[in-house]
Curated annotation (Swiss-Prot):
The keyword Zinc-finger does not apply. CDD domains: F1-ATPase_delta. This is ATP synthase epsilon chain 1. GO terms for cellular component: plasma membrane; proton-transporting ATP synthase complex. Belongs to the ATPase epsilon chain family. It comes from the Bacteria. Its main location: membrane. It is a peripheral membrane protein.
Length: 141
């Protein structure tokens, strides 16, 4: 079966590099599915889960907080603002961050504080959704 080279990198480190049969991720206009030979594309990525079906059939999950996606017929590059391996996601921390952001929204004094709290809430909510999606795909409840 045909494969495509996939690289997921953040400012801190390379998160994934390898051959894959399929990649799914949250694009700016909705969920994107990428197969080998995909038409070239550059788009922004929304916070959420990147699912990579590796060459050996195993699935890799990476949470991204946004970034840029570049697709070429033989390569996919995800340049993430922040990226966390699925196995390293901490549900308790994400839930705590969500609660703090919701409280901050209630107690903001300026537009800047409100915008910051909104961004933090969106990040935590996307992280929790990625954790739930990962758990569902792995058959855990």
């Amino acid at each position: 079966m045909a494969t495509i080279k996939v690289d997921v990198v953040s400012a801190e480190e390379q998160i994934f590099s390898g051959q894959a049969k399929f990649v799914a991720l949250p694009g700016e206009a909705g969920e994107l599915g990428i197969l080998p030979g995909h038409t070239p594309l550059i788009t922004r990525i929304r916070p959420g889960a990147v699912r990579i079906e590796a060459e050996n059939g195993e699935e890799e999950f990476v949470f991204v907080a946004g970034g840029i996606l570049e697709v070429q017929p033989g390569a996919v590059t995800v340049l993430a603002d922040t990226a966390i391996r699925g196995k390293d996601l901490d549900e308790a921390k994400a839930e705590d961050a969500r609660k703090r952001a919701e409280e901050a929204l209630q107690n903001t004094g300026s537009n800047l504080e409100y915008a910051t709290a909104q961004a933090e809430l969106a990040y935590a909510t996307a992280q929790l959704a990625a954790i739930q999606r990962l758990r569902k795909l792995r058959g855990q409840h």
